[in-house]
Regions:
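Fe(II)/2-oxoglutarate oxygenase catalytic core
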Residues: 1-198
């Protein structure tokens, strides 16, 4: 990892990098996503869940010049090859939108988790960009660590999902997207796996 603006926790590594994405790039990503949003589902679920209230869409890394540049910049910060990352996911949370406490990593104690890991590898790193400032609410909370990150346009939040040198879930990586109370919240996320995705 490159040296962050703010190191929030050491194990798992949780850190923020300020002004990584420009205001123009944030606006372009929002504009690209606006007309493509679908109701979000929880990983592994087949229907809309009350756990997650948002809309999302996905972009291949080379689908647009701004998408490519932002994705390459993030990969250079986390020091993982970009082809180890899933497509870029852009999400909008309106007032009342939230994502209850969850893990981004796949559960090695379930058949679905083991199957997914064998096929595409574990999600090792989460890299989340805040695309706008939120009027009220919408923080990213790590409840077991009492760490709360306020959305700030262009800031990148990076955290490890697994124990050091392992694909086993780090229990302190549990996090949630707090309720948006005013305005809306836009984020873009890359999940980096332990093996190539393409």
């Amino acid at each position: 990892m490159k040296k962050p603006s703010n190191l929030l926790y050491d194990d798992p590594f949780i850190a923020s990098y300020e002004k990584i994405v420009t205001q123009k790039e944030c606006s372009e990503l929002i504009d690209l996503a606006k007309n493509q949003l679908e109701p979000s589902k929880v990983m592994g679920a087949s229907k809309i869940s009350e756990v997650r209230k948002s809309g999302h869409t996905w972009f291949q890394h080379d689908s647009h010049e701004t998408v490519r540049q932002v994705c390459e910049r993030i990969a250079s910060i986390v020091k993982y090859p970009l082809n180890y990352a899933e497509q870029l996911q852009v999400v909008r949370y309106k007032v009342g939108g939230k994502f209850n406490a969850h893990f981004d990593s796949f559960d090695t104690f379930t058949q679905l988790g083991r199957t997914t890991i064998s096929q595409s590898g574990q999600r090792i790193i989460t890299a989340l960009i805040y695309l706008n400032n939120v009027s009220l609410g919408g923080e990213t909370l790590f409840p077991d660590l009492d760490i709360k990150v306020t959305p700030s346009e262009g800031t990148l939040l990076v955290f490890e999902n697994c124990k050091k040198d392992s694909n086993k879930r780090h229990l302190f990586s549990k996090h949630e997207g707090c309720l948006v109370k005013e305005g809306e919240k836009w984020i873009a996320t890359l999940w980096f796996h332990e093996k190539s995705q393409y």
